From Swiss-Prot:
PANTHER family: HIKESHI FAMILY MEMBER, PROTEIN HIKESHI. This is Protein Hikeshi. It comes from Xenopus tropicalis (Western clawed frog). The gene is hikeshi. It comes from the Eukaryota. InterPro entries: Hikeshi-like_C (IPR048364), Hikeshi-like_N (IPR008493), OPI10 (IPR031318).
Length: 197
């Protein structure tokens, strides 16, 4: 029903079913993991009006599991990417896995999926710094890249009087770079995926 993927590792599709509506994936050597992808395999959909709350668990200093709500997957949104690198300290949150005796070793974390009503899931608040990756992070990266390129290119600006004639060099007027920069920003604001066409 579910799959779990960590970069550089094989896809896991062998979730351990710990209750009728609860599934767990083990993540060995979790200390080196930054992001995890949780997805539905497409073989069995959630029952109507149901979805999956996705939790991350790591052992605290005493070896007890600390569970944190990452987010959700549903039939309409069957996959999600979660950042877990900043979650390996601090306190957990309320979770449905607390009363279960799920074995956990010191360097193994777990991803838990709890099948719940969509209405119940909507009332839960995932931890903020595990936010599912969205287009906003891509847009933010693109904006930083544009700013960096424009600042770098204009740092070499010289006036026409300062130019040394060199037939092997090609010069681009800074107003052309500025025009490109503004056009790219405008197009990104209208459609963040325009560059794919």
């Amino acid at each position: 029903m579910f799959g779990c993927l960590v970069a550089g590792r094989l896809v896991q599709t062998d979730a351990q079913q710990v209750a009728e509506d609860k599934f767990v994936f083990n993540l060995p050597d979790y200390e080196s993991i930054n992001h995890v992808v949780v997805f539905m395999l497409g073989t069995v959909p959630f029952p109507e009006r149901m979805g999956g709350s996705v939790y991350f668990s790591y052992p605290d200093q005493s070896g007890m599991p600390v569970w944190t709500l990452l987010g959700f997957i549903t039939n309409e949104k069957p996959s999600a990417i979660f950042k877990i690198s900043g979650l390996k300290s601090g306190e957990g949150s309320q979770h449905p896995f607390g009363t279960m005796n799920i074995p956990q070793t010191p360097s193994v974390a777990q991803i838990g999926i709890s099948v719940e009503l969509l209405e119940q899931m909507a009332q839960q608040t995932p931890v903020a710094n595990a936010a599912v990756s969205t287009i906003d992070s891509f847009t933010q990266f693109t904006q930083k890249m544009l700013d960096n390129f424009y600042n770098f290119a204009t740092s070499f600006a010289v006036s026409q009087a300062q130019m040394t004639p060199n037939p092997s060099e090609v010069f681009i007027p800074s107003n052309v770079v500025l025009k490109w920069y503004e056009n790219f920003q405008r197009r990104m604001a209208q459609n963040p995926f325009f560059w794919k066409t």
